[in-house]
Amino acid sequence: MQPSKVNKHRIIFHIDMNCFYASVEMAHNPSLKGKPLAIAGNPEERKGIIVTSSYEARGKGVKTTMPIWQAKKLCPDLILMRPNFDRYRAASREIFKMLAEITPYVQPVSIDEGYMDITDTIYAKDPLVTANQLQQRILSGLDIPCSIGIAPNKFLAKMASDMKKPLGITVLRKREVEKLLWPMSVEEMYGIGEKTAQKLNSIEIKTIGDLAKKNVYELKQLLGVNGERLQNRANGIDNRLVDPEAVHDFKSIGSSQTLPHDSTDVTELMQLIHELVDNVERRVKRKEAAGKTVQITIRYHDRKTITRSKKLYNYIDNHREILFVAKELFEQHWNEAPVRLLGVSLQDMETKRNIGEQLDLFTYEAIEKKEKLKVTVDKLTKKYGSNIITSQKNKNESQENQQPRTSFQKDFLDDYKKP
């Protein structure tokens, strides 16, 4: 399917589920409603961080990424629950099915938010009625609240959906940008993170209005092409299309995990890298693809984040090769400070069908032999379990039966993609 068309009169919705994980848990167990609830990585040990929380908890000062001990100090009666990703995934599928019944132009951007373009549908006659009906259908069918932004482009729709929560419906017209958006601080603008905001502040840009009116040359000097792009958004200009196929495109496959506590334990960190590589390999195989660049992400206890990558001569797709490069990068660039999050990704992706056309005979024969062995191993693993075959290196290590920890948002998008 082609993306939605470009014209000046499009009707774009941005649908954002309110406190999604917490809302799903409350729908599953209504006795939790009206109580301060937080989803956290490791509530038993009180060393994890808050993944998300209900509005009741937020009212007491509980915030995402806050350590559990700090959240409990602010809100002693806080109810803590581990995440149930299967439950969240199932709820998300049902929500996006409802959106797809209105228009084929639906673009998910994460498990709990997405865009839809209703311009060329019968629902375009009264967008507010359509938004209200959709909101009520999700609430009555799944007991999950959402906010909806309605605007002529994706950026304004996203900004609109953030204006009223929970259960808000907001229309934001381009002519209202100066009145409604320009007084807001740049930190509140979608697409601007903490570091970008600091850079903008350094050249006296404090509000969205300041950004909209700044000399574009200065912005490009500071932020490159992104400077002009952000200025366009600040002026309400965004020509991106709602593209249902965008979820099918991929240039990288990655997995990341926040640790239950800040760690300097090399054994623990290496074990996590193993698990992340396991997950990357599984998803790479599912796509029948390979990549030429391995990247690691390290986020420290103070939230400072670094990414380091290594470009390879040949495409790789298996655990051993990805792990070798990931460990090498980690050992070279970790400064031994406590680590809060690790990530591994394989980038510069290409399908094996396309890669095959680039291989010479000798390379192909070597890969073919390796592939035959790996197919046999995969079949045995599938039939008898992951413990049937272990490498000589790992034969004395304990094998874990649990699913590797994953970057859940990317897994969700994989689910949404058509086979």
From Swiss-Prot:
The active site is at E113. It comes from the Bacteria. Its cofactor is Mg(2+). It catalyses: DNA(n) + a 2'-deoxyribonucleoside 5'-triphosphate = DNA(n+1) + diphosphate. GO terms for cellular component: cytosol. Binds 2 magnesium ions per subunit. It is found in: Cytoplasm. Monomer. Poorly processive, error-prone DNA polymerase involved in untargeted mutagenesis. Copies undamaged DNA at stalled replication forks, which arise in vivo from mismatched or misaligned primer ends. These misaligned primers can be extended by PolIV. Exhibits no 3'-5' exonuclease (proofreading) activity. May be involved in translesional synthesis, in conjunction with the beta clamp from PolIII. This is DNA polymerase IV. It comes from Oceanobacillus iheyensis (strain DSM 14371 / CIP 107618 / JCM 11309 / KCTC 3954 / HTE831). The lineage of its organism: Bacteria, Bacillati, Bacillota, Bacilli, Bacillales.
